[in-house]
Amino acid sequence: MSEISNNNEYIPRAERRNKDGLTEKEFLEQYNPGHYERPSVTVDMLLFGMSRDLKCLKVLLIKRNNHPYIDCYALPGGFVNITESAYTAACRELEEETGLKDIYMEQLYTMSQPDRDPRMRVIDIAYMTLIPIDGIKPQAGDDASEALWFDITFNDEILTF
């Protein structure tokens, strides 16, 4: 609805009514969030590392210490807590699983395929960064048994790491 009434008077936000005649307060009092299923939200971090001489490009992977995909390599990541932003969760998970902190990351992509996680409906927000890796040694922690840099190699047909 408009914030201006029919006689051109300003209507304060708290007094504005929707098509059912409800103010925002009345609407929220009767609102039932249980009408919608709740997906979980996770974050993953894609960390590229470059040597200072620019001759070596690597990607940081962790070895999962638990199901699903136990003993498989994956991007560092985990669940977003209800009280934190996705970026805060990304920073927390990166430090918990690799020991790395104070690394600036950019949001890259949101993955929302309904069956992408075997546990439940999960929406994942991926972050990415490129950092100099000379002298940076990740330390596995939390639910990661390893945290390692893998070389990225290019050939005519595929990218491998």
Predicted feature residues:
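N-terminal leader/linker segments that precede catalytic domains of diphosphate-processing enzymes
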Residues: M1-F161
